[in-house]
Amino acid sequence: MNVTLLIPARYGSSRFPGKPLAPINGKPMIQHVYERASLAKGLTAIYVATDDDRIKEAVEAFGGKVVMTDPQAASGTDRIEDAITQLGLKDDDLIVNLQGDQPLIDPISIEQVITLFERHPGEFSMATLGVEITEKAELDDPKHVKMVFDNNFNALYFSRARIPFGRDTNDYPVYKHLGIYAYTRSFISTFAKLPLGRLEDLEKLEQLRALEHGHKIKVAISAFDSPEVDTPEDIRICEARLAVD
């Protein structure tokens, strides 16, 4: 099975312009993401998908591969669709979509979503990761997306609100969604053609489109948190963790 990992990276960000190139312990963030991803077993190729020449130059400077995407791409999914079309990937090729703001991603987490497709072929459309929340501040923070799943680890819902809600107790696990997906090339083409979902629009969570249209998302639970960098303040947290990693 051919497995291509794509790292979508945009230079423009209202909260953190130039985020992929933000230095973390002397390297641009996108390099940390790329190098950690390259440690995962089972990958055929890794590419950064970007529409910005500055990111392209930075990636090529450390020896990474880049595919340039349409700057008019309306969403991350459209950018991925553009990239896989340019790369000429086949319908049954597996795509791993890793967000470019996860410099602490653990390679084992990437291997987990690949393993789901190897062990359960044809049983679901997408695979993703969750991790149990251990920091209380994250429970009610909308930037940390929560998730619930059934007894077979099929996702039931994703929300910026705390889910599930314990009516009589707060003593129960809550899981956070990690920004990594896996799907076949044929599914992402199908997904890109689906109309915007009502819940997707409310929560501003693209994965809800799949659930709203009846597609299954299989979940693996990771032992490793991989916090995303959303603001310049998050850089200091990453630097501290990388220093002891």
Curated annotation (Swiss-Prot):
Pfam families: CTP_transf_3. Its EC number is 2.7.7.90. GO terms for molecular function: 3-deoxy-manno-octulosonate cytidylyltransferase activity. InterPro entries: Cytidylyl_trans (IPR003329), KdsB (IPR004528), Nucleotide-diphossugar_trans (IPR029044). It is found in: Cytoplasm. One of its GO terms (biological process) is lipopolysaccharide biosynthetic process. Pathway: Bacterial outer membrane biogenesis; lipopolysaccharide biosynthesis. GO terms for cellular component: cytosol. It catalyses: 8-amino-3,8-dideoxy-alpha-D-manno-octulosonate + CTP = CMP-8-amino-3,8-dideoxy-alpha-D-manno-oct-2-ulosonate + diphosphate. It is an enzyme of class 2 (transferase). Gene3D superfamilies: Spore Coat Polysaccharide Biosynthesis Protein SpsA, Chain A (3.90.550.10). Keywords: Cytoplasm, Lipopolysaccharide biosynthesis, Nucleotidyltransferase, Transferase. The keyword Transferase applies. Activates KDO8N (a required 8-carbon sugar) for incorporation into bacterial lipopolysaccharide in the Shewanella genus. NCBIfam families: kdsB, PRK05450.1-3, PRK05450.1-5, PRK13368.1. Belongs to the KdsB family. This is 8-amino-3,8-dideoxy-manno-octulosonate cytidylyltransferase. It comes from Shewanella woodyi (strain ATCC 51908 / MS32).
